[in-house]
Swiss-Prot record:
Positions of the catalytic residues: 25, 58
Its EC number(s): 4.1.1.11
Keywords: Autocatalytic cleavage, Cytoplasm, Decarboxylase, Lyase, Pantothenate biosynthesis, Pyruvate, Schiff base, Zymogen
Uppermost EC category: lyase
Compartments, as annotated in UniProt: Cytoplasm
PTM text: Is synthesized initially as an inactive proenzyme, which is activated by self-cleavage at a specific serine bond to produce a beta-subunit with a hydroxyl group at its C-terminus and an alpha-subunit with a pyruvoyl group at its N-terminus.
The protein, known as: Aspartate 1-decarboxylase 1
Pathway entry: Cofactor biosynthesis; (R)-pantothenate biosynthesis; beta-alanine from L-aspartate: step 1/1
Cofactor binding notes: Binds 1 pyruvoyl group covalently per subunit.
Gene Ontology BP annotations: alanine biosynthetic process; pantothenate biosynthetic process
Subunit and interaction comment: Heterooctamer of four alpha and four beta subunits.
CC cofactor: pyruvate
Family note: Belongs to the PanD family.
Length: 118
């Protein structure tokens, strides 16, 4: 049996933009993606701490060092610049494969700069 577990998360990132006319996704600073071990086009869940909205989309890479956290397409209706969000990536494995699994947590400041990776 496969179990679904948290692989990684970017904790309390600040939304920097919302682009309704873009085709979809969440644009994330390439440094954040790398630190969280999230691949471009990987499915992610986004939780908005300001309004409680939860959504599923996919990550796309924004310019490294830009601090970008931009909700695109329909997701742009669920967040506004300045909102705080948690970006979560999940994976599956057997009980044996996951025995020693620990999720990667990337903590950021209000400018979306990495302050700690646990």
């Amino acid at each position: 049996m496969l179990r679904t577990v948290l692989l990684s998360k970017i904790h309390r990132a600040t939304v920097t933009g919302a682009c309704l006319e873009y085709m979809g996704s969440i644009s994330l600073d390439a440094q954040l993606l790398a630190a969280a071990h999230i691949l471009a086009f990987e499915q992610v869940h986004v939780v908005n701490l300001n309004n409680g909205a939860r959504l599923i989309t996919y990550a796309i890479e924004a310019t490294a060092g830009s601090g970008a956290v931009v909700l695109n397409g329909a997701a742009a209706r669920l967040a506004a610049p300045g909102d705080r969000v948690i970006v979560l990536a999940y994976g599956q494995g057997t009980t044996e494969e996951l025995e020693n699994h620990q999720p990667r947590v990337v903590h950021v400041d209000t400018g979306n700069r990495i302050v700690a990776c646990v």
